[in-house]
UniProtKB/Swiss-Prot annotation:
Protein localization: Endoplasmic reticulum membrane
UniProt family annotation: Belongs to the ZIP transporter (TC 2.A.5) family. ZupT subfamily.
Name of the featured protein: Zinc transporter ZTP29
UniProt topology in membrane: Multi-pass membrane protein
Lumenal topological intervals: 28-35, 85-123, 178-187, 241-250
Record InterPro entries: ZIP
Residue ranges of the TM segments: 7-27, 36-56, 64-84, 124-144, 157-177, 188-208, 220-240, 251-271
GO MF entry, a single one: metal ion transmembrane transporter activity
Inducers of expression: By treatment with high concentrations of salt.
Record's keyword terms, sorted: Endoplasmic reticulum, Ion transport, Membrane, Stress response, Transmembrane, Transmembrane helix, Transport, Zinc, Zinc transport
GO cellular component, one term: endoplasmic reticulum membrane
Function (record text): Zinc transporter involved response to salt stress. May act through the regulation of zinc levels required to induce the unfolded protein response (UPR) pathway.
Loss of function: phenotype: No visible phenotype under normal growth condition, but hypersensitivity to elevated levels of salt.
Length: 276
């Protein structure tokens, strides 16, 4: 392993492990109530939607054209929709929630809380997968930036580190709420960030020449479709259920604004020939 590879790997670790910092904000605070959980789920939904549409899908359109990018994007949507058909998912309608609690009393309330936690855990695991898929190409970007020069690599790694803190929150929050385990929340958030150094290793060793830029951009467009689907199918319903539609929508747009600002400053750190 040459020195350039070691530098890129170290920088990607700095950027990737900042998800752990976001997780610390969650695990060092008290377990949120249901409304707070809904607001934070809405915030995380905004983060995910911005990544999907303003980052991954946008770059795919610019790189391979509108038609091909849309084929990849909706291919990702269909692919993940098919997967969710075969994954057992706890469903819970907000309209029946209160009626069941009144009918069954305390025991019913405990049963409903268990279902809530299962549903939130499912959402958290899907979020962790989506964030990992998003972090993977960021590791590739750090590697390519490091090749360009140390200054570019360092600036890019620091920008990604700031960019990844709210992603750590998005992963750790539902895991902590569902499992009540600080370790599980911290561990999964950290693992999602480790996709970045993994991206460095893979792009350096496995795909130095074989993976064409068009295929890579298409795959990232498909990742955007996957993330958009899981946000609209899994995360937003939870946010509406727990926080109410009006408050959840505000949280969504606040999350979108935060991630958009993060993507903007991240873009400023990239050389002119690169984009995320």
């Amino acid at each position: 392993m040459d020195s350039q590879m070691l530098v890129a790997l170290g920088l990607s670790l700095v950027g990737g492990l900042s998800t752990s910092l976001g997780a610390l904000f969650v695990v060092l605070s008290e377990t949120p109530n249901m409304k707070m959980l809904g607001l934070l789920q809405g915030f995380a939904s905004g983060l995910m939607l911005s990544i999907s549409f303003l980052d991954l899908a946008h770059n795919a359109i610019n790189s391979i054209g509108f038609f091909k990018a849309n084929l990849w994007f909706f291919g990702g949507v269909i692919f993940f929709a098919c997967i969710t058909k075969f994954i057992p998912e706890p469903t819970l309608g907000p309209s029946t929630d209160g009626k069941r609690r009144k009918k069954n009393g305390d025991e019913g309330g405990k049963d409903m809380m268990k279902k809530h936690r299962k549903q939130v855990l499912y959402s958290g695991l899907i979020t962790a997968i989506g964030i990992s898929l998003h972090n993977f190409p960021e590791g590739m970007a750090v590697f390519l930036g490091s090749i360009k020069g140390m200054r570019v690599g360092v600036n890019l790694a620091l920008a990604i580190a700031l960019h990844n803190i709210p992603e750590g929150v998005a992963v750790a929050l539902p895991i902590y709420f569902a499992t009540e385990s600080k370790w599980q929340a911290f561990k999964l958030a950290t693992l999602s960030g480790l996709a970045e150094p993994l991206g460095v290793i893979i792009v350096a060793y496995l795909f130095p020449r074989s993976l064409s830029p068009e295929i890579l951009e298409g795959l990232l467009g498909a990742v955007g479709g996957i993330m958009a689907f899981l946000t609209l199918h899994e995360m937003l319903p939870l946010a509406f259920d727990y926080a109410g539609q009006k408050q959840a929508v505000k949280a969504v747009f606040f999350g979108m604004a935060c991630m958009s600002a993060s993507l903007y400053f991240l873009e400023l750190s990239l050389p002119e020939t690169m984009s995320l």
